[in-house]
């Protein structure tokens, strides 16, 4: 029940854990660092999968599946890649009761195993581009774990594409980060900053990494998706060449991009409150619940409740009727608030007699009485749209309130305690590392979002907030998950 939840003001970390557990989204596993995604949590992931998969296919991608196990020799082919992932890898040394001749790495990411196949599939420019996505699980041996945000095993999608030119590969990288931005803002109702990672923060083995960064309610950043320009690194590692139109041989250009179940963590931390989970309707598997108040003429109330359920389902609303009598209506109200059901419809004997019902919205807790007529389903759909829009606008207002341009190092140190600091940086890894060491804040990205860049004057010259050296562009500093 909702009263068990620790308040955000009291302990934000415990509040998050309480919501994950009490809303029955996930639970701890007996396997260290792993989690059990419960039906309520998996239903959100299925909604995310469906929306993203549709967008991937609309942009020309197809799904495939590659092995979970990767030979050690494959991992070692790309030096930067293995250096970046080796500490996180789980390694299989025995199988069938015997020591393996070659160790097998449990997939931390799939570039190497996929490019071993691409080498076989690509001979000519006619074989390009290859636009493949994979839905899979990956394993990274995390030392400090938190449900959804950082676990040893997690679910994700990873896109891997092969192209004839660098221009095409770069276009793919930017196309897919835009897909992620659209998904975050239109489905998750979370405003994000699109940007490029610094050299020290980019993906191991990439030329460039683009990202979307979101702000959580404690002012910290969460990287919600990445898209990598891999250049020809993996093609060279696997000697993957193609014959061009003029007959010459060239290495293939590549991209990779991915999001994971940490998006569920982002969803929780961006919107939820001290009563429990708050879900944007587009990602809620149950958008509305009908709670009949079964006293007086129970039969009439139930009959009208069933009629309402049919009306709403026919209109495409994902609604369910809770006509159980084990729990009181008040218990149900609190429970469905905790579970984040966007709309609650209350129906009692007086409502039935008046031809009306009470409708409560989860995001603001506002209630209104609506006529039960032919327009009722559309009113509920409009309400769901209003909740979706309202959540985004509220999150955007919050981010803007917690984002500040700073011109001194003292200002930066104070600002990263509450939100995002936009500041000039001299472009050196030494300055970046020193700021991280002293403040625990990292450069989240070099923003490329036009609206954000314009609002905060990103592309202006100035002096580095730390060193005082010349700076060509401002960046976003924040503490992060």
Curated annotation (Swiss-Prot):
Keywords: Aminoacyl-tRNA synthetase, ATP-binding, Cytoplasm, Ligase, Nucleotide-binding, Protein biosynthesis. Signal peptide: none annotated. It holds the Pfam family tRNA-synt_2b. It catalyses: tRNA(Pro) + L-proline + ATP = L-prolyl-tRNA(Pro) + AMP + diphosphate. GO terms for biological process: prolyl-tRNA aminoacylation. SMART domains: ProRS-C_1 (SM00946). It is found in: Cytoplasm. GO terms for molecular function: ATP binding; proline-tRNA ligase activity. Its EC number is 6.1.1.15. GO terms for cellular component: aminoacyl-tRNA synthetase multienzyme complex; cytoplasm. PANTHER family: BIFUNCTIONAL GLUTAMATE_PROLINE--TRNA LIGASE, PROLYL-TRNA SYNTHETASE. Consists of three domains: the N-terminal catalytic domain, the anticodon-binding domain and the C-terminal extension. Belongs to the class-II aminoacyl-tRNA synthetase family. ProS type 3 subfamily. Homodimer. Catalyzes the attachment of proline to tRNA(Pro) in a two-step reaction: proline is first activated by ATP to form Pro-AMP and then transferred to the acceptor end of tRNA(Pro). This is Proline--tRNA ligase. It comes from Chloroherpeton thalassium (strain ATCC 35110 / GB-78). The gene is proS.
